[in-house]
Design a protein with these regions (language model features):
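C-terminal catalytic lobe of FAD-dependent flavoproteins
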Residues: 171, 268, 306, 310-434
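Glycine-rich FAD pyrophosphate-binding loop
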Residues: 45-65
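Conserved, structured C-terminal
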Residues: 425-453, 461-463, 473, 480, ...
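Flavin (FAD/FMN) cofactor-binding and adjacent substrate-gating region
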Residues: 2-8, 91-94, 98, 106, ...
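Dinucleotide-binding Rossmann-like beta1-alpha1 core, especially the glycine-rich loop
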Residues: 70-148, 268-273, 277, 299, ...
Length: 822
């Protein structure tokens, strides 16, 4: 019997009560009975939470799990994703014995092919991450590829990457096994029990409505796959995912032994092949997918679309050319079924910003089987502990902008997202569709100035100004933007540059309770004189870093809070929750306020040319702000700088920003003024060791291990959020952050590279870039607390080679901070 794509699976096989009405209350309700929901249920039970009910609208696995190909991999492109995937690979090997269900786990390995040198570079980086995480992986040559895959025509192949421990599992039976194991531990499973609504009281979830009655619960998990977006939207929660057609086809009998063949990924031709009995399964990740709105998906379980051979014709031809046996065997089954994809092709999980107690685990981008055990384990721990127990920044549901859940936006992005799984994963890659949706007030000026525009969370921003075009600039070794970014970097270090920082998340906290709100929300002491600012962290209740930024007291009862662009959605809701019970209002100023960063040793001179105010150090000291006249209007100038140079952040009404920029441009012409993009800013901030939210710090990091203890005021009259959790930690930090610079200026760092001492891994980079003033690639690295950063045996691994590096506890550029203080 062909057990793949089995539509007969049901919880009734182990839970006779699966057809009963749900219980009136539970500790946790999980919406969705696919492999993600089943994994969360099982891992919650393992954590001791068994008062759980899984509500499935049809039967188990009938959403998208049933038609998955079941690929299992131990390594992904980052340490976080590898941690999730590696646990899954280990778990599937034990699931059959654990559950009593034959889940069909087979581990013949996997083989990824490179048909061009750039792809070989990408595979080499992936091998490095795998090595660091303890996943066996080997770059292989053509002779080794022939031995691993005798049916493969090696023409056009330049290299391969072999993971001996990878394989595949039967996805439907794996989900059934997880659900059965969860049920054995006390979890309830209900089929034909569609969740139709979510109850909210005072910003917190209190239960759900189903087609068979209501369930009261303080925690609800939305694990409904492609239907999750619409269900979340019922209560105003943004979950940006969208469906697309996803195809795999099964060949006829091959006529040769195929059972021991590794999973084959011919990523340059957008397909994978894995054995299935005496046949081969061919799956497609075509460059241009076919998005499908939920309304197009057939009602009921096990939905499919009409087979569409013409759409995958190029992929079929490429596969038959590479594996000629497919031509003789032909194909006898075509499955075209829905799968969901996200704007950045990374899964979504975590607690929502808008509703406390409402969690999401969805948008797996056709990798749900790979991630299900890891997602289940980590979300269960998150629910039990109240905060993530791993570096969740890249997968957190709160990382998106709300507009990215717009269906038109998602429809266009999903055309691209499906193919991105097998496309080149260039450093700094920018999505191509849809673009120009969310713009700063200066967007058109940037375009006219020849900016290469990128995006962050859907916000357009300049990466650099002038040639080359973005599409021609991608490279792992020396990107095309290297020289132009270097010139912009030098402009800030030696003269003066302007950076559009309008994307900063900006909030006003005002009212009689504003000070109390921020003293609780911020780690620093914000009881400041008027027009003074402080750098601070915003922690969760367990001491993890939700965001960092500045707080400026602009009046006795009014504060300006500025945090990174990516934190806007998270910070709005965090501040609102922290202000509950206080006489304070939180207002999002982001869209209505532009910010121009004027940075460099000649920034004071430039500002004095466009403003009659006194810009001396005495009149405008470091971390001070004030209202100023500038150009033909007024602005608020804050003397802070993320570049390590003297500088000012100029905050003005959005409709004045062009006037301010034009005045600066005219006045600074003879000073060599340049517009500066975000890639130069990244290089500048790394030379100073400034942390970047989402890469260097996040909810799993505490201030001490992140090297940011200076931003914590331990002796405030009222403890700040997370303070008690930090103080109760029995042990000091096990890791710390160091600065790393390569000796060889020709080798490029991007982040995720392994740091070693005498060849033994001791940590990895969280950020990397070229430091133009330092003269080589630099980065921030998390290493063991006992690692001596000045050890002369320090090295960083790049594409399998350990390159000599120097380390430091302090930044390589102006470690005393004299230049930024002016």
């Amino acid at each position: 019997m062909d057990r793949l794509a089995d539509r007969s699976l049901t919880a009734a096989s182990f839970a006779p009560e699966a057809s009963d009405d749900p219980p009136a209350q539970a500790e946790v309700v999980i919406v969705g009975g696919g492999i993600i929901g089943a994994s969360i249920a099982y891992h919650l039970a393992r954590e001791g939470v068994t008062d759980v009910v899984v509500c499935e609208r049809d039967t188990l696995t009938s959403g998208t799990t049933w038609h998955a190909a079941g690929l299992v991999a131990g390594a992904r492109g980052t340490h976080t994703l590898t941690e999730l995937a590696a646990y899954g690979r280990e778990f599937y090997a034990t699931l059959g014995a654990l559950s009593g269900v034959d889940v069909g786990f087979t581990a013949p390995g996997s083989l990824s092919l490179a048909r061009r040198p750039e792809r070989a570079d990408e595979l080499a980086y992936a091998r490095d991450v795998a090595d660091h995480c303890g996943i066996e992986a080997h770059m292989v040559d053509l002779a080794q590829i022939r031995r691993l895959w005798p049916l493969l025509d090696p023409a056009g192949i330049v290299a391969g990457l072999h993971f001996p421990g990878d394989g595949y599992v039967n996805p439907g039976y794996a989900a059934l096994g997880l659900a059965k194991a969860a049920h054995a531990l006390g979890v309830s499973v209900r089929e034909h029990c569609a969740v139709t609504g979510i109850d909210i009281e005072e910003g917190r979830v209190v239960g759900v409505h189903t087609s068979r009655g209501s369930v009261a619960a303080p925690t609800v998990v939305l694990a409904g796959g492609l239907w999750t977006r619409d269900l979340a939207a019922l209560v105003g929660v943004s979950v940006p995912l969208y469906a697309a057609e996803h195809v795999h086809v099964k060949s006829g009998p091959i006529g040769a032994e195929v059972g021991g063949l590794p999973v084959l990924r011919d990523v340059d031709n957008s397909y994978y092949i894995r054995p299935e009995g005496d046949a081969l399964l061919l799956g497609a990740f075509e460059p241009r997918g076919i998005p499908r709105p939920v309304a197009d998906i057939p009602v009921g379980g096990h939905a499919t679309f009409t087979p569409d051979w013409p759409h995958i014709e190029d992929i079929r031809v490429a596969a038959e050319r590479a594996v000629p046996a497919l031509v003789t065997a032909g194909f006898d089954r075509f499955i075209n079924a829905p799968e969901s994809f996200t704007p950045d092709t990374t899964l979504i999980m975590g607690e929502t910003a808008e509703v406390a107690g409402l969690f999401v685990a969805a948008g797996m981008n056709s990798q749900g089987i790979i991630y299900a055990p890891g997602v289940g384990r980590e979300l269960a721990r998150w629910i039990v502990s109240g905060s993530p127990c791993f570096d969740s920044s890249a997968v957190d549901v709160q990382r998106f902008s709300p507009h990215q859940a717009n269906r038109r936006y998602l429809h266009e992005r999903t055309r691209e997202s499906l193919g991105r799984l097998y496309a080149m994963h260039w450093p700094g890659y920018q999505s191509e569709t849809p673009r120009g949706v969310r713009r700063t007030p200066l967007y058109q000026r940037h375009v006219e100035a020849g900016a290469a525009m990128g995006e962050l969370n859907g916000l357009e921003r300049p990466l650099w100004f002038g040639p080359p075009a973005l599409v021609d600039a991608y490279d792992f070794r020396r990107p095309g933007w290297h020289d132009v970014v270097g010139r912009e970097h030098a402009t800030v270090r030696e003269g003066v540059g302007v950076i559009d920082l309008s994307g900063f998340a900006k909030f006003e906290v005002a009212g009689a309770g504003a000070l109390e709100t921020l003293q609780f929300a911020a780690s620093a002491d914000v009881d400041l004189p008027v027009d003074r600012a402080v750098y601070t962290l915003f922690l969760n209740d367990h001491g993890g870093i939700e965001a960092d930024g500045t707080v400026t007291r602009v009046a006795a009862d009014r504060f300006l809070v500025v945090t990174p662009s990516s934190s806007r959605h998270r910070m709005l809701w965090l501040l609102r929750r922290r202000s509950q019970g206080q006489a304070a209002t939180v207002t999002d100023l982001t869209s209505g306020t532009a910010v121009l960063g004027v940075f460099g040793p000649r920034s004071r001179e430039l500002m004095s040319r466009v403003s009659p105010d006194d810009w001396s150090a005495e009149a405008h000291p470091y971390f001070a702000g004030r209202r100023v006249e500038i150009a033909d209007g007024f602005a608020y100038a804050l003397r802070v700088s993320f570049t390590g140079e003297l500088g000012f952040e100029v905050y003005c009404d959005a409709d004045l920003s062009i006037n301010v920029l034009d005045a600066l441009s005219e006045a600074g012409a003879d000073l060599g003024l340049r517009m500066v993009g975000y890639l130069a800013l990244d290089s500048l901030r790394l030379e100073k060791g400034y942390r970047h939210l989402g890469h260097d710090i996040g909810p799993y990091d505490d201030p001490v291990s992140a090297g940011l203890s200076f931003a914590v005021a331990w002796n405030k009259e009222v403890p700040f959020a997370g303070q008690r959790a930090l103080e109760q930690r029995a042990q000091g930090p096990s890791t710390r952050v160091i600065h790393v610079a390569l000796e060889d200026p020709e080798v490029r760092l991007w982040g995720e590279e392994t740091v070693s001492v005498d060849g033994e891994p001791v940590g990895h980079l969280t950020s990397g870039a070229f430091g133009y003033t330092v003269g080589s690639s630099i980065g921030l690295a998390v290493v063991g607390v006992d690692v001596d950063p000045h050890d002369t045996r320090l090295s960083v691994r790049v594409r399998g080679v350990d390159h000599a590096a120097r380390g430091s506890r302090s930044p390589f550029y102006d470690s005393a901070g004299a230049r930024v203080r002016g």
